[in-house]
Amino acid sequence: EPNMDALIIPVTMEVPCDSRGQRMWWAFLASSMVTFFGGLFIILLWRTLKYLWTVCCHCGDKTKEAQKINNGSSQADGTLKPVDEKEEAVAAEVGWMTSVKDWAGVMISAQTLTGRVLVVLVFALSIGALVIYFIDSSNPIESCQNFYKDFTLQIDMAFNVFFLLYFGLRFIAANDNLWFWLEVNSVVDFFTVPPVFVSVYLNRSWLGLRFLRALRLIQFSEILQFLNILKTSNSIKLVNLLSIFISTWLTAAGFIHLVENSGDPWENFQNSQALTYWECVYLLMVTMSTVGYGDVYAKTTPGGLFIVFFILGGLAMFASYVPEIIEIIGNRKKYGGSYSAVSGRKHIVVCGHITLESVSHFLKDFLHKDRDDVNVEIVFLHNISPNLELEALFKRHFTQVEFYQGSVLNPHDLARVKIESADACLILANKYCDDPDAEDASNIMRVISIKNYHPKIRIITQMLQYHNKAHLLNIPSWNWKEGDDAICLAELRLGFIAQSCLAQGLSTMLANLFSIGSFIKIEEDTWHKYYLEGVSNEMYTEYLSSAFVGLSFPTVCELCFVKLKLLMIAIEYKSANRESRILINPGNHLKIQEGTSGFFIASDAKEVKRAFFYCKACHNDITDPKRIKKCGCKRLEDEQPSTLSPKKKQRNGGMRNSPSSSPKLMRHDPLLIPGNDQIDNMDSNVKKYDSTGMFHWCAPKEIEKVISTRSEAAMTVLSGHVVVCIFGHVSSALIGLRNLVMPLRASNFHYHELKHIVFVGSIEYLKREWETLHNFPKVSILPGTPLTRADLRAVNINLCDMCVILSANQNNIDDTSLQDKECILASLNIKSMQFDDSIGVLQANSQGFTPPGMDKSSPDNSPVHGMLRQPSITTGVNIPIITELVNDTNVQFLDQDDDDDPDTELYLTQPFACGTAFAVSVLDSLMSATYFNDNILTLIRTLVTGGATPELEALIAEENALRGGYSTPQTLANRDRCRVAQLALLDGPFADLGDGGCYGDLFCKALKTYNMLCFGIYRLRDAHLSTPSQCTKRYVITNPPYRFELVPTDLIFCLMQFDHNAGQSRASLSHSSHSSQSSSKKSSSVHSIPSTANRQNRPKSRESRDKQTEKKWFTDEPDNAYPRNIQIEPMSTHMANQINQYKSTSSLIPPIREVEDEC
């Protein structure tokens, strides 16, 4: 009876397949064996017959060939024999079979899209059949199943039908059918496909050898190579090892599961044991590892024999494969891999100097919440794996940031990050490196590598030294017209500082404009409240509505400010030949065209949309600017999409030039070309400007001619000048002082308006910089050290307009807190100095300027306008100073009376808000700003460099020096560009608005009357207090609202038009070219101390002293120089302290020209 029970298979009432319980496993196995051996017999029989046919017919073929040769002459007429027709038919048949075979080969080799789909589908279905086997392994080995009711059997049947078709394709494509029949994949099909058809016929299922489907895993690596997923040798090897190991393991477990659950046939299947498939997997693992716990073991004879042989092979495989797999995985780069581009999402590649500081600053600005539509993924590529802090930063931004380890100098790594499909590549520089030239060389090599791999990729790179920008022009595929940009940190940071010498606080305002800053609301009435309201403003660009077409720039600017609450400072103008240029406050001569885009200062990108949506018909009566939205009128803006915003790059296809990069666009008023008097007096043989007409120029001077000793400098009273205190030695890295001097020598200043520049520092260092400075006028050198007070007194630092403190030794110190020690010590040294007040009060160049026409003084007194200035400062605290810092946290040491927390961000500190401190880190925001709008960089460079153009850079790249040019109408036309100035409200035509007036009224009056565009206020820090304060510190307010109340001591930032007539009155004062050379010793900022009260004797005494000492400080004065008049007037010390040393210009502004009201 027990024997009978062992023979009975499970029988259900619905499916009475065998009432006797007879096993039918042999039928399933026989189907596979018959298929295999039957096919093998047919192949061998076919080959044998084919061989015999070939041997037998070999002699007959030779006889036919002989007959053909003998009868060839009789067929000279060209007719074909029937034999030829038969041969053509045979050839056609062979060709058809060959084409079918080739097609089948292509289908299984994944050379086409259909083939790749087929290969992947076969593998996927094989894994699916294996999963079905795993599911069925929980059932008995043999059971009754109805095909029409068993869902898994139906799926398995469908899979095997597909395998049968695929087997046919493989058979057709096989070059050798015998070897194909013996392949592993063929054997798998023989023992898995036929049993399924037998199952349908017998209505019963046998688990059998279906586990052989696991052997398909061996092809996993091959399929991944077909799909071009695996490319590296390590990845291919790793997948091969894993697939062979796992497939062998699963297949062996399937065999143990079959024999152990079936039992020995010769024992009448009585020694079977119920083991699940996963217990067999466990058994094989402990067997391979030779652990053998004994909890599970084989009881059947086939199982035991299999285990004996499996230990031999399995142990060898386990001992060799597992260590190799672990080694490959362990040595595999954590940040290897390749970037997978997401459809519909752009990505950029960031490389170069990748550190926690540089990446955090970049991500903070790039992913700022104000950029609400940034759909860009950031891919960092660096050859060093990130440390734990940087890795944590990447994980915090994992949705938008990925890191890959590699080098941009390796084309394979560039392919990994998909540089060819990247929207741009950004290269960061190490601002604190010891060797800036070496760092620039590294970045240039990165550019060369990237451009060599993909010439069309847009690159934005940081450069440290200005002279290294020239090397980028040597790269053939470098094209700034297509968006390639080089952000030169030396050029910009020194340009910002130079503009602060002309209008103190401007560096802070510009830095806040191109960086994204969140609005921080402060309720109490302090200077922080108004400063932070301005910090929330940024620079945006947007197309102008068609309602502005035909109006002049001042009219549109006023309308935007008054009605739309937007401040427009520049436009992108497209000339007739479609060349695009940025024009800053171009004046009333220019009319707005269709498709013109404007540059706006606003707090939100949504606000700027008002300029695009504005419709005169629909919005003319609206007073609330928030209600200005897209109306139903059919306008041109509806047809042309708005693409200019801070979040979208501007690609116009034209040239991105500075306002004066080309003289093609000229004023349409008679002031553009010099008057007849100027042309008559203009000596065409005298070079006063460089060849582009953008900067004042003089013949190269030897450095010995501009060097003065301390005693010689003390004999000359300098006033209204710029003192540059520089720390450096013979081996220090060059700062690039040319970038500081060039903005101060811009040609839109008249010669008498140029501030004299005095360098105080090591002569060994300045000799290295002199090659780039010897073409600029009004430059002097005092060898010494800025820490010596005697040197500072010798250059009259208490009478200067600005003291700049720079250091070339900042990056040679490992301790970051000590990097700025020299600059901080010099700043504190100056602030602690005391000065004598015995000279009196000098009415000289003022903090602001007063428009001409308000002062009817004589020509001799005409240069003297505006506010009164106290030159004899009693304490160094009131000296205007701007200090450059490397480490932002060191800003806390500059002001001893501030309450800034050491952890306060730089832009929130008092020294930065007051414009007395500048750090190169604020320029990091330019990378993001340039990517989203490449015209922003052009605008910033135009404002801070004084007019540097691509043409000028090409010239400097050629000669590394400015080339002198003759004064022609074309070069003089380039002088006609606006500049930044500060307008005083204490007196002059705007004095009535200074006492409680409205900023909006001042804006409109200045714009209509003088074409001056106001954009900010430089206000005393304690102006909001009801009680008077002795503090002379000021802070910056950017773009105040219309109703903002003014105070008399305010200084207004404005964009001032070039005055063509200011130079003519000066020329009328000049004498002959020989006699004027003597008077030229009296520059606009140099006053000698008289030995007597007789003022007429001063030029002669100075001339005689020059002959005796043979020291010529100013040998390059123009012929129209004039002696400066000094008037002594009493003045209250309190008022002087509030308004002194904040002078940006002493120029006369153009005559009053009323602007027509076009609104």
Swiss-Prot record:
The chain crosses the membrane at residues 25-45, 117-137, 153-173, 178-198, 203-223, 239-259, 306-326. GO terms for biological process: adult walking behavior; cell maturation; chemical synaptic transmission; circadian rhythm; eye blink reflex; inner ear auditory receptor cell differentiation; intracellular potassium ion homeostasis; locomotor rhythm. It comes from Canis lupus familiaris. Phosphorylated. Phosphorylation by kinases such as PKA and/or PKG. In smooth muscles, phosphorylation affects its activity. Residues 551-571 are annotated as: Segment S8. Residues 615-619 are annotated as: Heme-binding motif. It catalyses: K(+)(in) = K(+)(out). The modification Phosphoserine is found at S645, S658, S662, S858, S862, S1101, S1104. Its main location: membrane. Residues 639-668, 1066-1124 are annotated as: Disordered. InterPro entries: Ion_trans_dom, K_chnl_BK_asu, K_chnl_Slo-like, NAD(P)-bd_dom_sf, RCK_N, Slowpoke-like_C. Residues 274-296 dip into the membrane without crossing it. Expressed in all vascular and smooth muscles. This is Calcium-activated potassium channel subunit alpha-1.
